[in-house]
Amino acid sequence: MLSAQLEAYLAEINLSATAEQKKQLIDFVGMLNKWNKAYNLTSVRDPEAMLVRHIMDSLVVSKHLQGERFIDVGTGPGLPGIPLAIMNPNKTFVLLDSLGKRIRFQKQVAFELGIRNISSVESRVEAYQAEQQFDGVLSRAFASIQDMLSWCHHLPAENGLFYALKGQLNDEELQQMPSGFVIKEIIELKVPKLDEQRHLLKIIKE
């Protein structure tokens, strides 16, 4: 059932996946559902809803990624980082979260599903110092763009981008961008079976 739904959703967003990638995505939902009962990783309880709200909500960003090295800040159980890593095996993803149970889950997912292009790090973002900066800094965890830019300003490489995943846009928030940062592009995202606004903001350092 989930496999057929995934197939239809991928076609809807015009994203092609191998049989192995589809299996990994479905197995990720299975692991999330199983671990969630004990670890409380997400408020979404139903696998079909997870497929929409977690997998597809992450994958609509995939075709907009530029570069090879990414960090997903406040990734929780690995969202959007794990679905994006599955679909982009030639890119690398650091998954950053401050809660140990989430990091343990991510590492188990990587081990069981054979995902080799992610590394999970338990750290607060402001304390994290990368050996090499990133082409893209992703997050759907921050309440405000200002918080994201303030805490993650040290992470992108010289021409790196911030990818802020937002629901409904707040005009006031957009007008109060911190100095030194510019919104390069605002992309309206369409998530299959999700009747809610979704936006991707690409932000650069001036």
From Swiss-Prot:
GO molecular function annotations of the record: rRNA (guanine-N7-)-methyltransferase activity
InterPro entries associated with the record: rRNA_ssu_MeTfrase_G (IPR003682), SAM-dependent_MTases_sf (IPR029063)
Name of the protein in question: Ribosomal RNA small subunit methyltransferase G
Catalytic activity: guanosine(527) in 16S rRNA + S-adenosyl-L-methionine = N(7)-methylguanosine(527) in 16S rRNA + S-adenosyl-L-homocysteine
Pfam family, one: GidB
Superkingdom of origin organism: Bacteria
Family: Belongs to the methyltransferase superfamily. RNA methyltransferase RsmG family.
Entry's Gene Ontology cellular component terms: cytosol
Residues annotated as binding S-adenosyl-L-methionine: G74, L79, V125, E126, R140
